[in-house]
Amino acid sequence: MPCTLERNALSYSVAVRALCEFSAKVGDLDLRFTPSPTAQEGIEGHRRVVARRAAGYESEITLEGQFETLKVRGRADGYDPTCNRLEEIKTHRGDLSRQPANHRQLHWAQAKVYGWLMCQARQLPNIEVALVYLDVDSDGQTLISEHCTADELQAFFETQCQRFLAWAQGQEQRLAERKQGLQALGLPRIRRSARASDNSQKPCTRR
């Protein structure tokens, strides 16, 4: 499971990307898209996209939300308040049409989760959710967007959270059962050790 899950006595906490990598997974989600940009090229590409936006554009917006015992947090790439558009920025190299379908699904999942968190934070009834792809070689930009209502995005968010919680709680239950099983197996050994200790304390009898 490629994510970090924090757990305390009251709730779980997970990053948006980890939530989406789990709940939006279809088939084998191999995150390698060859040829793909390096991490540094990705960072620089994000900066180039943000630099082209108009004044008032917001970037790296910290957002969080809650569903039952699951807290979800992360930073949205960008938001344009003039057109009410939440942007998820991705970099690529080469023909975008060759991108695997499950990669696109993961990107939409991230964008829609951030879209809901933004609607919740700003009390927005609707929002435009967009994927912005920058080709790091040609510097060309492709924008794909959907107009969504807050209710639609909330329903999407809750579905992802329900799937994740079911998995997390199942994992916890299996770990608890395994721990109980190991403890049960350890009891006879403890008793044998105790008997051995008792015998070692008895005085020797010479014949």
PLM regions: where:
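Short, well-ordered alpha-helical scaffold segments within catalytic/effector domains
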Residues: 46-47, 108, 112-114, 194-205
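Short acidic (Asp/Glu) and glycine-rich catalytic loops that position anionic groups and cofactors
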Residues: 23-29, 91-93, 137, 180
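Mg2+/Mn2+-dependent nuclease catalytic core
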Residues: 64-156
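ATP-dependent helicase/translocase motor core
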Residues: 124-207
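Hydrophobic, Leu/Ile/Phe/Ala-enriched alpha-helical segments that form helix-helix packing faces
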Residues: 49-53, 115-122, 204
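Short coil/turn segments at secondary-structure junctions
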Residues: 33, 98-99, 188
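Metal-dependent nuclease catalytic cores that hydrolyze phosphodiester bonds in DNA/RNA
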Residues: 1-84, 109
